[in-house]
Each structure stands twice: as C-alpha cells, then as structure tokens.
Amino acid sequence: MLSERRLKVLRAIVQDYVGTEEPVGSKALTERHNLGVSPATVRNDMAALEDEGFIAQPHTSAGRIPTDKGYRLFVDKLAGVKPMTAPERRAIQNFLEGAVDLDDVVARTVRLLAQLTRQVAVVQYPSLTRSTVRHVELLSLAPARLMLVLITDTGRVEQRMVDCPAPFGEASLADLRARLNSRVAGRRFADVPALVEDLAEPFEAEDRGTVSTVLSTLLETLVEENEERLMIGGTANLTRFGHDFPLVIRPVLEALEEQVVLLKLLGEAKDPGVTVRIGHENAHEGLNSTSVVSVGYGSGGEAVAKLGVVGPTRMDYPGTMGAVRAVARYVGQILAES
C-alpha cells in the first residue's frame, strides 16, 4: 500500500505529464506542486514508485512517466470525475436538442464528444434488442400496397413496403392498426412474435392473407435491424499522441476500422458508471497504447447503447470521464423526450 505522500507524488507526475507531454523530474515536481518535502525525498519516492511499476524511465530521459499501472491507480483512487460547468452543460443540451432524428442525434453526439475531449469519439446506435415499440403506423399507398412504419422508444424509425395478396380496405387497415398497437406498443422487441401470433384470427378470410403479410414484414424488420451500428468521429485527434504518433497511428486506425472490436470495447462499459480501460487492459493489440472511456446511455434509466472515446493513455482522465458521463446523460434525456 502506497503512503499518502507517494500517492500525492504519483498524482503530480500524472498531472504534469498529461499537461506537458514531457517526462517529469523531481525538481519540476517540487517547484510546481506543494508536496511539502525536498527534491531528494521526492526522488526517493519516485524510485519507490518505479520499483513498484507505477512509473517508468523512457529511454535515457532524466524524468519519469506513468505506466498503465500508474494511470490505473490514478483513475481508481486519485482522479475523481470533473463535473461540467453550467455553461458547458447548457451548450451540450442546446446542441443536442437541435437534432431532427436519431441519425442526427448520433452524429451530433459524436461531434460533441470529439470536440469536448479532443479524442476519437465512438457512439453506438441504440440496440433494438433492448428497445421497445413506441408505435406501428400503417399507410395505404394503393389498393394492394401498404407502408409499414416502425417507431421505437429511442426514436428510431424503420419503413417497409408491403405488397398485399389482395386489396385491403381502409376499415380493415384501421382495425389492423388499432389491434396491432394495442398488442405491441410499449413492449420489448423480443416479446412481439408471441404477442401477434393470433392477430389475424378476428379478420375476415379474404383479409387474413394481408394481415399475415404485414405481420411477417414487421417481424422481419425486427430481425433485419438487429445489427449493431456505430458512428466514429474525431480521428484527426489521434495526432495528439505527440512524439509517438508515427509509431502508434497505424495499429490504432486499423483497430478503429474493425467494428466488432469497438462494439466489444463499448460492451465492457458497466451500467451506470463510467468504465475506463487503460493501455494493455484493452484486449486488442492495436489499442495497447490507448485508453477507452465509455458509458451506457438510454431513456428511462436503462442503457440501450454505449458511447465513449479512444485516446492516448496520456489523457485528462477527470475531464474526459466528466464529459463522457454528461453527454450520455443528455443524450438519454433527448431520447426520452423525442
């Protein structure tokens, strides 16, 4: 267990290295921070921190930098989450409230996260497996052609054309629309098949074929749109890796191109708190020089998707965690109100 003084030294090393991007020496630490001890004592503390693997000496530099282990202790014990200021919160809310649909919400969220954190932003579309049906609309386009519109609780809208086996009248259409919504509105996608199993029975024989076709189209839509989707932005921020940029950029970009890798990373976010994966804690080798900060978001207090950022391990953890958490909260509010 590290002493309180050595924890203060480690915190100072992390803060200085993040701020200056240069290895940190004992003289600089005593000048910049009120540690209450001499440079010689700080040197001894740094030697102990190095022996325990919390800091390391890069190449021949006289200074030290945090290791993954050092960053982990900093995040778990020393960092806390930096809250957003009132003007920042208002700016986030106003920007997100301008969205016109779900795609716009996700696009604005990506742009906002990248700007706030100066990292690569990754936002997962709300998962339909966790979604509920808000409404199913049926529109007549021709005597034997309908449009089915599925609207989810997260504001996602899916449209499908339905070619009917026979003409379908307005009265039958209104009846089907009412019966269908009475069964599925507010229910989870996974429950829908069982809920509509016998829906065609009350209809006249000549209409049952169309009702069955509509139900088949609805169920196919639920399956088709179950594929997970992501949006990424701010890859230009990778240049903030600094001196190591030429060495790390290719493997990081390759990892970011693999959607399954990103989905797995975001999937590690624990509800409701912020999850931080540092350096070699990331299973994908291409991301061993990065940290991933992620959190779930959704309406009604239940996460339906994840969002987060990817950046160098040398990141402002308190600020990044605060921004990710705040954006997730406001996105959830927007979805609940949409």
UniProtKB/Swiss-Prot annotation:
PANTHER family: HEAT-INDUCIBLE TRANSCRIPTION REPRESSOR HRCA. This is Heat-inducible transcription repressor HrcA. GO terms for molecular function: DNA binding. Negative regulator of class I heat shock genes (grpE-dnaK-dnaJ and groELS operons). Prevents heat-shock induction of these operons. Disulfide bonds: none annotated. One of its GO terms (biological process) is negative regulation of DNA-templated transcription. The keyword Nucleotide-binding does not apply. Coiled coil: none annotated. The gene is hrcA. Keywords: Repressor, Stress response, Transcription, Transcription regulation. It comes from Streptomyces coelicolor (strain ATCC BAA-471 / A3(2) / M145). Belongs to the HrcA family.
